[in-house]
Amino acid sequence: MANIKSAKKRAITSEKRRQHNASRRSMMRTFFKKVIAAIEAGEKENATKAFADMQPVLDRMATKGLIHKNKAARQKARLTAKIKAL
């Protein structure tokens, strides 16, 4: 553990951020899996609705820096293509 006061504070802050980010990342993956499950089941309406729910979450995570903005764009583009192919 750190000896300097500011380093101790940073360690505590880092741990809080890590847990917060893990929670957000898990939520994002859950939304993503719902879309994939609907696509694999061949349910276009459910896939479209799940995608509409997932899109703002993905954008928010990209804005907050949890994922890169290009990754968010790439995931949205690929899922849109899969939904259109149904």
From Swiss-Prot:
The lineage of its organism: Bacteria, Pseudomonadati, Pseudomonadota, Gammaproteobacteria, Vibrionales. Keywords: Ribonucleoprotein, Ribosomal protein, RNA-binding, rRNA-binding. It comes from Photobacterium profundum (strain SS9). GO terms for cellular component: cytosol; small ribosomal subunit. This is Small ribosomal subunit protein bS20. Belongs to the bacterial ribosomal protein bS20 family. NCBIfam families: S20. The keyword Transcription does not apply. InterPro entries: Ribosomal_bS20 (IPR002583), Ribosomal_bS20_sf (IPR036510). Binds directly to 16S ribosomal RNA.
